């Protein structure tokens, strides 16, 4: 693990904040993935098991992802100003309000305290009072497991299952290079806690006819520029395959193809609005994402483009980054 990575706050600071509040509201980011939902609900289940007197509320919308995880959400209308004034807000796996589901609750600035648990090497606009930010972790869910282990909290099977989902998905099945000994050790703690590993593997690795058709279209229509391979999921494609922009977020279909060091998905979300997913096998794509107002990790980042003309510029900038 790189000792020079971005860090802010600590496990002890996060544990202290959680222990000090009897009402806790946990947020996830927009375009939810396995890590933000797994960290959110894993943390909620941990708190409910170890501090049964505390009230824990998960707010947001999973967008039909992982229905088998049996997530329970509280309607945001139930998070009243009176509740917020007594509560700790916990934001997992995110740093800016524009990236957070139910951000309007945070905009009111009514929470008694705000804790950020995140593995992204970015600053934030959350007005946090407490932090556990550490970019050496592969997933926010890994941070939550480490927190639980170091605090000697009991890991229930439902909590362990949610947290394993977060680590498994954000590490791309433990294939990403920043998977560490700690990742595997904490993963083993989830096995020991009887996480439903088989269920997660079965659910995430089965293939439908729609999946095959999606991949077939991508493989027939991808584009290349020197050592960069990419696909544009425009509205025409989405209509043809009857998929939503969120369902198009599958950049790793083009992963690790010989000679292509960076792979990209450009997903049209609206007029002159393209979301870019950057991935690489070692090249720093975060630098390119930052140039276009995005961010993320060295090998996995994202950004939003305001013009279709920027697509080729991004591709060219990625090729330049390979040459650095």
Curated annotation (Swiss-Prot):
Bifunctional enzyme which has both oligoribonuclease and pAp-phosphatase activities. Degrades RNA and DNA oligonucleotides with a length of 5 nucleotides and shorter, with a preference for longer oligomers. Also degrades 11- and 24-mers, but less efficiently. Directionality is controversial; shown to degrade 5-mers and less in a 3' to 5' direction, and 11-mers in a 5' to 3' direction. Converts 3'(2')-phosphoadenosine 5'-phosphate (PAP) to AMP. Divalent metal cations; Co(2+), Mn(2+) or Mg(2+). Its cofactor is Co(2+); Mn(2+); Mg(2+). Keywords: Exonuclease, Hydrolase, Nuclease. It is an enzyme of class 3 (hydrolase). Its EC number is 3.1.-.-, 3.1.3.7. Belongs to the NrnA oligoribonuclease family. Disulfide bonds: none annotated. It catalyses: adenosine 3',5'-bisphosphate + H2O = AMP + phosphate. In accordance with its dual activities, is able to complement both orn and cysQ mutants in E.coli. Monomer or homodimer. GO terms for molecular function: 3'(2'),5'-bisphosphate nucleotidase activity; exonuclease activity; nucleic acid binding. This is Bifunctional oligoribonuclease and PAP phosphatase NrnA. InterPro entries: DDH_dom (IPR001667), DHH_sf (IPR038763), DHHA1_dom (IPR003156), Oligoribo/pAp-PDE_c-di-AMP_PDE (IPR051319).
